[in-house]
């Protein structure tokens, strides 16, 4: 009887930590994602005389992971990869504004709108103002 109680306690403890271990494993795996895991196509386009980084996201980026930490890690990782690849492009500037626009698109446009157009000519505003202006302040 004591052995059964011990085994039950062990089973309960193991199942209690499954979400923790799954999130930890997934978070570690996020760092192995590459630029191509997140983006179908990224190109500079000119619209109405304004340069824009046109971003077509893949499902890896727009998927709802059901865990804010995992979602945030994907957003952060993907933006770092995007910035590292394009920050030396002649049209890239205003990184903070680009980051706000990107975050807004990831969080609110997701897969409902593609491409996402990040415009480096836009000034940096607060994130709440960026949201109010539908990601392009």
Where are these regions (language model features)?
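A generic structural signal for short, solvent-exposed coil/turn residues
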Residues: 19, 45-47, 96, 110
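Intrinsic disorder/low-complexity segments enriched in polar/small residues
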Residues: 6, 27-29, 102
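N-terminal export/targeting and maturation segments
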Residues: 23-65
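Acidic/histidine-rich, surface-exposed loop or edge segments in extracytoplasmic proteins
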Residues: 53-90
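Terminal low-complexity, poorly structured segments
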Residues: 3, 9, 77-78, 114
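Extracytosolic low-complexity repeat regions of secreted or lipid-anchored proteins
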Residues: 85-137
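Sec-dependent N-terminal signal peptides of Gram-positive bacterial secreted proteins and lipoproteins
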Residues: 1-24
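Cell wall/extracellular polymer interaction/catalysis modules
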Residues: 30-41, 45, 80-87, 94, ...
